[in-house]
Amino acid sequence: SLPQSDWARWLPKNLTQAWRLEKLQAGGEVWLDWRDGQVQRAVAQLHAPELAGGYAQRKAVKVQDLALTAFFTRTAAGFDLLLDSLALSLGETRWGSVQLALQQQSAAAGREEQWTLNADRLDLAPLGPVVSALAPLPEQAAEALHALQPQGVLSNIQLSYRPQRTDADRLQYSLNLTQVGISPWHGIPAVENASGSVSGNLTDGDGRLASDNLGLHFDQLFPDMWRYRTAGAQLLWHYDSGGLTLRSPYLQVVGEEGEVAGDFLVRLRK
């Protein structure tokens, strides 16, 4: 049993490492099954009325009423971790509850190391400041997240990371979108109210859109955003050191100009 206390002053630096914990008011309960010199199973229930901190020199973020239940199981290949009923408050905004499942597979003969993350639903806009402040992202990724300002809802999220690989399939993903939007950044177009599904890897992606009130803005090419009452399309993209290639083999939209169907190919060089 962990009593409600400010744990920030008790946690050793070798545990927090690059994270700065200004306050960690938390308590809960933990059950452990310890065998063969390591944890085999664990269950934890945590409630943190207040958490304040940041990663490295990034601006700190304050989180209130963080709650979760965690289940850990060691397997023959690695481990499974389930975070259930994860929820928190950011000011007046309540985020969650969310279920996250992390599976780790260690490298072995005939088997590569792999990390798999599944999430049922993520509301992006409230989550942005938390990720920016606490996630150990490379500076370029942190800059991209700040510039893109993602919003909307992601669901049925599946991520697969294979750290030993050097090709584009090192990271693979698939997810559903509901009214997702991003701001323009380095040739990537701004998007508003995109709904559908997306899958891909580090360099290539495939998006299937079925959206109402869709907005699309190539800020390096056109002064204004294209707006459509309805839009259905397949969008394919390729991103590398040369820039972004975006194409649509089929596109059907209804806007101020009426019904339009066709295809397009856009190349944006760095």
Language-model features: locations:
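Ordered, soluble secondary-structure elements with a strong preference for glycine-centered loop motifs
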Residues: 188
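Extended amphipathic, helix-rich lipid-handling scaffolds
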Residues: 1-93, 103-185, 196-198, 203-204, ...
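Short coil-to-beta strand junction motifs in C2/discoidin
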Residues: 192-193
